[in-house]
Design a protein with these regions (language model features):
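N-terminal targeting/assembly segments of extracytoplasmic apparatus and virion spike/baseplate proteins
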Residues: 1-24, 179-190, 200-222
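Charged- and aromatic-enriched interaction segments used to assemble
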Residues: 1-94
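Acidic, small/polar-enriched beta strand-loop surface segments
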Residues: 57-156, 160-204, 218-220
Length: 223
């Protein structure tokens, strides 16, 4: 059960209750108000981090570091991904999955008997794609104006993902970090840091290779 506490505080409490060791934990700052029944500890923490992402537009990754829990924002790893350091790659771009250019949040003000609407939109992409609306009801209007802006920042991007196959390995690369990508795909030049969503390391006959799943929205420099 989690109520009115930041993800950082939640992780510390779970660690204390289950006798887990904590390393350095980033301060997520945003107090999450929710109750999770019949959920795993991982799901409880992930739900809290997801709410923090939607409210503040910040990604946090929780992982084990030498027996201690570590929570941090995306960090840069000194690893360059190019057409010469990888065997092959697959590229996908879509606006069909979790892409929105208009955010609408509704709060039912029972005292006044009205529904308050909070909106944010990107007119440029509405003209380009038509209206792709995200709608949700919220329990509190506190921070609603900031939340719609954060959600627009998260979702108003074409979903661009790249799968890199058999690139030179680096044990410092793990999910949640950022690697520098320099590729030309379908005439579009990518030269930016991208988020590692998933990594698989392979060690064979003294050779270290890895497969990566990367994402980066419109390959902006916000990281």
């Amino acid at each position: 059960i989690s109520k009115k506490r930041t993800s950082t505080v939640l992780i510390k409490k779970i660690a204390k209750d289950f006798k887990l060791n904590c390393g350095k934990l980033a301060n997520t700052k945003y107090p999450v108000s929710r109750i999770d029944d019949n959920a795993t500890l991982f799901d409880i923490v992930q739900n809290s981090l997801d709410e923090t992402l939607m409210a503040r537009g910040k990604i946090y990754t929780l992982y084990d570091e030498f027996g201690k829990l570590r929570l941090r924002e995306p960090w840069k790893v000194n690893r360059l991904i190019t057409s010469t350091t990888a065997e092959s790659y697959d590229y996908k771009e879509t606006i069909d999955d979790n892409v929105y250019n208009q955010i609408k949040l509704a709060y039912d003000n029972t005292k006044k008997g009205v529904q308050e609407i909070y909106m944010a939109k990107n007119s440029k992409y509405i003209n380009k794609w038509g209206v792709l609306q995200y709608f949700d009801k919220i329990d509190s209007r506190k921070g609603a104006k900031l939340k719609v802006k954060a959600l627009l920042k998260i979702y108003c991007k074409t979903g661009k993902t790249i799968k890199i196959n058999n690139c030179f390995g680096d044990i410092n690369v793990r999910a949640g970090c950022l690697v520098l990508v320099k590729l030309t795909i379908y005439g579009e030049t990518i030269s930016n840091y991208m988020l590692v969503d998933k990594v698989t390391h392979t060690f064979n006959n003294g050779q270290h290779l890895m497969d990566l799943e990367l994402s980066g929205g419109d390959y902006d420099s916000s990281y």
